């Protein structure tokens, strides 16, 4: 059934196909918990079929997809539609994050916990209505979400201040080289620390995506993940493309 049946130095029994993997690493299929497959609404960039195929080429056999598409996945109806799309288009295992907004707490409360992967909260700028910057909305989200809360953490006020500062300084010469100055350590830390504080306040399950600073690491406890309610991750490319 297109699955690995046995890994061994010697295979005596009959097999449909035997692959010699001498000198290679054999690892389980990878799970990517944060992908942007752009379907529906933004398929000129990619879609569920093309991107899941690309993932398989790199060993990713399961994915959790983001809600910042068009229309946004901020309702249970739109979430169900994405699952229907994937049932005929995904080439690997799949799930989808429900997206939070400042106003969709009732949708969050009634989500099927056996369907959605997690609740994605953009605490920094995002597509459409998906920036969650209202503290009362954040309180409700961390208090009532039946799903693990996963966050993109940047303090939008600080980012806007930095944008104005560096635009006044560089004008039209402002470029990607200044990205880390605009979305700086302080903007990330302010938001990540707020998320951690809210998770502790409401005893929520929290996972913070793509940490980018040593300072943020101080918010999390070292050691094995077992039993932890507050966790985080980093992106490998951030380890290489930085100022060090």
Where are these regions (language model features)?
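Histidine-rich, glycine-flanked metal-binding segment
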Residues: 1-28
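Active-site mouth loops of central-metabolism enzymes
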Residues: 33-46, 69, 92-104, 130, ...
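Histidine/acidic residue-rich metal-binding segments in metalloenzymes
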Residues: 106-122, 127-244
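Alpha-helix termination/capping residues and helix-transition junctions
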Residues: 57, 88-91, 113-115, 203
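Metal-associated gating/positioning segment near the N- to mid-region
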Residues: 22-89
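Divalent metal-coordination and catalytic microenvironments
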Residues: 2, 23, 34, 55, ...
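Short, acidic/polar
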Residues: 44-52, 102-112, 194
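Short catalytic-loop micro-motif centered on adjacent basic/acidic residues
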Residues: 65, 95-98, 205-210
